[in-house]
């Protein structure tokens, strides 16, 4: 018998002038909110086991998981609950949206486009994750947990088919359309009510382009919002909803949601929002359909966790394609990584695949450094990350690997972006060791930390973006397979595993310039709505405001759409809603304007409405003053 607790909380960081994380573009900085980012936590407790056996699963709408975030979350949870939640039984996975603020990372590389570490965004993420766990911890109660699987086509496409085609026929035959359609739904019921779901599917969080400046949970964020808010009627500002839906990743390293190809800069501005909604709806519909086919997940929970120095693993021949003993190498970025992807181009002068200049340089280096050649060739090396790592933590080398079990479901926690065939090999290996059905074993990427990509040794040879971003060389996947096999064998045999050596503490660097004191007639409405609107039209208003970063309003909102009901005004939308957008623009050196848009939904009740803006101004002494402003009334007919 399992008991389950659920919790949700806001983790939205700085909505103004903060570098966004995902595409690696320094000029892609936050300038508002389309949808808020959220953490969803699930506590599973096995009531049939002695003691207090628990598993904590957190799905966070973040670009990347980070070691320093995990460490601070676990430190805070230890202050609250002692040793109830630990590295071993806590799995934190990111949805990999490319539309979230960055600067929260402990390793310098990921903060280069954000002017370094951003304490406010880091705090919002940690505070929100911890809050979601607090809600889940308090919510634990007996539940019926069931499991189902499906197939979803039309929500992903292989963005590196030439690399995929290098795999052996047996692997390619498993994915005849070059995509991984496998979906999994964990359903949580209490009595007659479904109170929570966790859906797993492989597709990238790149429906929003690198030209977007609004915070968004991308397609998985929309899927969760649609089920909770649109279908379930959740009011996130009023407390914990009765139903919580998390949409998690599996192995989407080479999976793109842009099934019609990347959007060109000339595409209509609303196209990326349409793509986000469409791919999110596909995932929601798949999950909703599976509700009727779920069967009991089974008894028991278990977890194994270890750290591995991924740059110095001696891999036994049983885990390599040719049966030969191999060794991984220290992290190095290839020219293919610098090129970026078709949907997010990188630096000028680089291309995916072969780069003759860098290939020639690397061949010369390989002749002088045979161990490096054995690990990294044919990568055209552009940046050996080991060198900056000696000066300051730049990328992570000692990484966490995890295996957890909920009933008959096994989750392999990988701290990177596995391609679909890399994930398949990990799944097959665990399934064979523990005696599980392959469908019940998932490779969950973006878990607990981040090491970039995980390709198969065959895909690596193509040196597309994914291969160039497989930092530890051609045998990285093989090293992870060896480590995961040890965890699976220990779980099967009921043995503990050694934790291994933890990564050294990171040191945050920041060169963010302090913002000037705000100036202006705060709250003045400089563009009022029209008098009358119909469903399908857009209401817009512009306010004199202040820097949104003065108060992130975590758990709150920068805007409200309110409707007159008798003598009162009732909130019917906020800045977390799909129908609203909140845009910030700097005016001069210290001024701010905020534009608020509400796309009137088709089912909107006719009546009198207003738009309300909430802001906070900071003076020269650092004193904060909250203000609110309201438009004139307008009518929806």
From Swiss-Prot:
One of its GO terms (molecular function) is metal ion binding. One of its GO terms (biological process) is ceramide catabolic process. Zn(2+) binds at residues 96, 204, 417, 453. 10 minutes at 100 degrees Celsius abolishes completely the activity. The active site is at 256 (nucleophile). It comes from the Bacteria. It catalyses: an N-acylsphing-4-enine + H2O = sphing-4-enine + a fatty acid; an N-acylsphinganine + H2O = sphinganine + a fatty acid; an N-acyl-(4R)-4-hydroxysphinganine + H2O = (4R)-hydroxysphinganine + a fatty acid; N-(9Z-octadecenoyl)-sphing-4-enine + H2O = sphing-4-enine + (9Z)-octadecenoate. GO terms for cellular component: extracellular region; membrane; peptidoglycan-based cell wall. 90% of activity is inhibited by nickel, zinc and calcium ions. Magnesium, cobalt, copper and manganese ions inhibit between 50 and 80% of activity. Keywords: Hydrolase, Lipid metabolism, Magnesium, Metal-binding, Zinc. Its EC number is 3.5.1.23. Binds 1 zinc ion per subunit. Its cofactor is Zn(2+); Mg(2+). The keyword Chloroplast does not apply. Mg(2+) binds at residues 34, 575, 577, 580. Optimum pH is between 8 and 9. It is an enzyme of class 3 (hydrolase). Transmembrane segments: none annotated. Belongs to the neutral ceramidase family. Catalyzes the cleavage of the N-acyl linkage of the ceramides (Cers) to yield sphingosine (Sph) and free fatty acid. Also catalyzes the synthesis of Cers from Sph and fatty acid. Cers containning C6-C24 fatty acids are well hydrolyzed, and Cers with mono unsaturated fatty acids are much more hydrolyzed than those with saturated fatty acids. This is Neutral ceramidase. It comes from Mycobacterium tuberculosis (strain ATCC 25618 / H37Rv).
């Amino acid at each position: 018998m399992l008991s389950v607790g659920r919790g949700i909380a806001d983790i939205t960081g700085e909505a103004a002038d903060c570098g966004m994380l995902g595409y690696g573009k320094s000029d892609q900085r936050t300038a508002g909110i389309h949808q808020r980012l959220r953490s969803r936590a699930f506590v599973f407790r096995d009531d049939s086991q002695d003691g207090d056996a628990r598993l904590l699963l957190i799905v966070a709408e973040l670009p990347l998981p980070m070691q320093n975030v995990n460490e601070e979350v676990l430190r805070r949870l230890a202050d609250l609950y002692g040793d109830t939640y630990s590295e071993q039984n806590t799995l934190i996975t990111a949805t990999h949206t490319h539309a979230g603020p960055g600067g929260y990372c402990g390793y310098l590389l990921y903060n280069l486009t954000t002017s370094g570490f951003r304490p406010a965004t880091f705090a919002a993420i940690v505070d929100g994750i911890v809050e979601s766990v607090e809600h889940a911890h308090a919510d634990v109660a007996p539940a019926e947990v069931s499991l189902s699987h499906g197939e979803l086509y039309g929500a992903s496409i292989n963005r590196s088919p030439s690399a995929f085609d290098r795999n052996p026929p047996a692997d390619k035959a498993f994915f005849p359309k070059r995509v991984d359609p496998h979906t999994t739904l964990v359903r949580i019921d209490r009595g007659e009510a479904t109170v929570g779901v966790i859906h797993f599917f492989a597709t990238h969080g790149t429906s929003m382009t690198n030209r977007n400046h609004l915070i968004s949970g991308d397609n998985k964020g929309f899927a969760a919002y649609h089920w909770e808010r649109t279908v379930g009627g959740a009011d996130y500002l009023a407390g914990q909803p009765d139903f919580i839906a998390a949409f998690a990743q599996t192995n989407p390293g080479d999976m793109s949601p842009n099934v019609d190809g990347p959007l060109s800069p000339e595409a209509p501005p609303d196209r990326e929002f349409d793509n986000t909604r469409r791919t999110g709806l596909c995932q929601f519909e798949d999950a909703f359909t599976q509700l009727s086919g779920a069967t009991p997940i089974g008894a028991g929970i278990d977890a194994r966790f270890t750290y591995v120095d991924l740059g110095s693993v001696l891999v036994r021949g049983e885990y390599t394609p040719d049966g030969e003993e191999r060794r991984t190498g220290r992290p190095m970025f290839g020219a293919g990584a610098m090129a970026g992807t078709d949907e997010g181009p990188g630096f000028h002068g680089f291309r995916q695949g072969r780069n003759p200049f860098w290939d020639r340089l690397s061949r010369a280096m390989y002749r002088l450094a045979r161990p490096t050649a054995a690990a990294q060739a044919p990568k055209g090396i552009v940046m050996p990350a080991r060198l900056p790592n000696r000066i300051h933590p730049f990328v992570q080398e000692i990484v966490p690997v995890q295996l957890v079990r909920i009933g008959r479901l096994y989750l392999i926690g990988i701290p990177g972006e596995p391609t679909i065939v890399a994930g398949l090999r990990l799944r097959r290996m665990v399934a064979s060791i523990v005696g599980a059905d392959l469908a019940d074993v998932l490779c969950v990427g973006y878990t607990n930390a981040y090491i970039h990509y995980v390709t198969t040794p065959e895909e690596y040879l193509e040196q597309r973006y994914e291969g160039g971003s497989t930092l530890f060389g051609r045998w990285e996947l093989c090293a992870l397979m060896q480590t995961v096999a040890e965890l699976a064998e220990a779980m099967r045999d009921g043995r503990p595993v050694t934790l291994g050596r933890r990564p050294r503490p990171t040191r945050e660097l920041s060169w963010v310039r302090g913002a000037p004191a705000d100036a202006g007639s705060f709250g003045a409405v400089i563009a009022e709505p029209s008098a009358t609107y119909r469903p399908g039209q857009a209401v817009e208003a512009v306010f004199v405001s202040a820097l949104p970063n003065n108060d992130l309003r975590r758990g709150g909102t920068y805007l409200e759409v309110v409707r007159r009901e008798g003598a009162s005004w009732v909130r019917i939308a906020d800045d977390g809603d799909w129908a609203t957008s909140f845009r910030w623009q700097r005016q001069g050196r210290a001024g701010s304007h905020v534009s608020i848009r509400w796309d009137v939904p088709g089912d909107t009740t006719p009546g009198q409405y207003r738009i309300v803006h909430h802001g906070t101004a900071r003076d020269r002494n650092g004193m904060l003053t909250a203000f609110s402003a309201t438009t004139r009334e307008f009518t929806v007919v």
